A protein has these predicted regions:
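A charged, aromatic-enriched C-terminal amphipathic alpha-helix characteristic of glycosyltransferases
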Residues: 307-338
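Nucleotide-sugar donor-binding catalytic core of glycosyltransferases
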Residues: 1-51, 59-66, 82-83, 89, ...
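Proline-aspartate-enriched helix->loop->beta-strand connector
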Residues: 71, 75-77
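Conserved acidic donor-binding segment of nucleotide-sugar-dependent glycosyltransferases
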Residues: 289-295, 304-309
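Active-site proximal beta-strand in glycosyltransferases
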Residues: 95-109, 129
Length: 343
């Protein structure tokens, strides 16, 4: 099939989708989204804030016109929109009129994307793939193809033959939230008292020095364990593969598993996850990973499985095996293709 893909290049997931489709023998054309705030000059952003709204309108219109011209030139079978950040109603309507299948793959919940916004887009979409399984209920009257499709892991980053030394006892990579900070403060206290190595990656505080000082004051035990920067998928994979235990702490508004779940399973580390995330058959609780009900139980899990390496490896290996043929990006895209070819 011929795919025309558009999306943001953040975090590397779009690149993984492109490589996986190409490796499967599909023709793939990519046109990146250029969001106004991340691509225009500082002065244009300032003028926009001062009321020159036409700057953004002109920017987005020019991007849409170029995308439509490229779609017409490439004549794909499928236009695949990743996450839909710049998918306007006018663009969706224009793409639907070209006769190509128009697929929206959401990488966040419908609540964040906008339920009303999605409702207006639906008449022009051939297929919608959702991040949260519960969001399928919001599409019950939608007559097009729909499926629950969480992001798969990048197989190229988790080569089974690679042999990384597991020199990190506990790791977590992600963005800050109130619940995550509460959990990690507790984990940091445990790691410090038990002389365990802990790695926490992500942008946890602003680069301005007073923000760093404020974070250090509020989280004095956690602070030394934090590497305060955004890690690439490659860097995150290296950390996970070096870890004995990886924590998966979900966001309050999300109920289905996040993409990190499959990356952690693929890494061969033992995954310990909060019980608020529904596995939806993508992994087995107590078999492939552990889920904790409260912080005391989480600390008990960490302490026990760091002390019993054999027990840790048993669960980690089961999770890695179960995950391999079910949750890779290749397997996930196969699900999407089946829905498009045999709806």
């Amino acid at each position: 099939m011929r795919f025309f893909v558009t999306g943001l290049m953040r975090y590397g997931y779009a690149d993984c989708v492109l490589r996986t489709l190409s490796a499967a023998g599909h023709e793939v054309f990519y046109f990146p989204m250029h969001e106004f705030y991340t691509t225009v000059s500082y002065w244009k952003r300032k003028l926009y804030k001062m009321g020159c709204s036409s700057l953004r309108t002109t920017h987005e219109k020019a991007w849409e016109e170029e995308l439509l011209a490229r779609v017409e030139c490439q004549s794909p079978d499928v236009v695949l929109v990743l996450n839909g950040a710049m998918l306007s109603l006018s663009l969706a309507k224009a793409l639907s009129e070209t006769g190509h299948l128009l697929v929206l793959w959401l990488w966040d919940g419908v609540v964040r994307f906008g339920q009303e916004r999605l409702r207006h887009l639906l008449p022009y979409l051939s297929c919608v793939a959702v991040f949260e399984k519960a969001d399928l209920q919001l599409l019950r009257e939608y007559e097009g193809a729909k499926l629950y499709l969480p992001l798969g892991y990048d197989e190229s980053l988790y080569d089974e033959a690679a042999d990384d030394v597991r020199d990190i006892d506990i790791s977590f990579i992600g963005m800050p939230s109130e619940e995550r900070l509460a959990v990690l403060d507790r984990v940091a206290e445990y790691a410090y008292a038990a002389h365990r190595t802990l790695f926490v990656g992500g942008t946890w505080y602003d680069r301005r020095f007073w923000k760093r000082l404020l974070f250090r004051k509020r989280h004095p035990v956690l602070y030394p364990f934090v590497e305060n920067r955004l890690l690439t998928l490659e860097e995150a994979a290296h950390v996970y593969r070096r870890s004995r235990i990886c924590l998966n702490i979900g966001m309050r508004e999300h109920h289905s598993v996040n993409p990190r779940t499959f990356e952690l399973l693929a890494s061969g580390a033992l995954q310990i996850m909060d019980a608020g995330q529904d596995l939806n058959g993508k992994a087995r609780r107590g078999v492939d990973l552990l889920q904790y009900e409260n912080m005391d139980q989480m600390i008990d899990f960490i302490d026990y499985y760091l002390a019993d390496e054999r027990a840790r490896q048993q669960i980690a290996c089961r999770g890695q095996q179960y995950n391999r043929n079910r949750n890779s990006m290749r397997a996930v895209l196969d699900e999407l293709l089946k829905e498009l070819v045999y709806p």
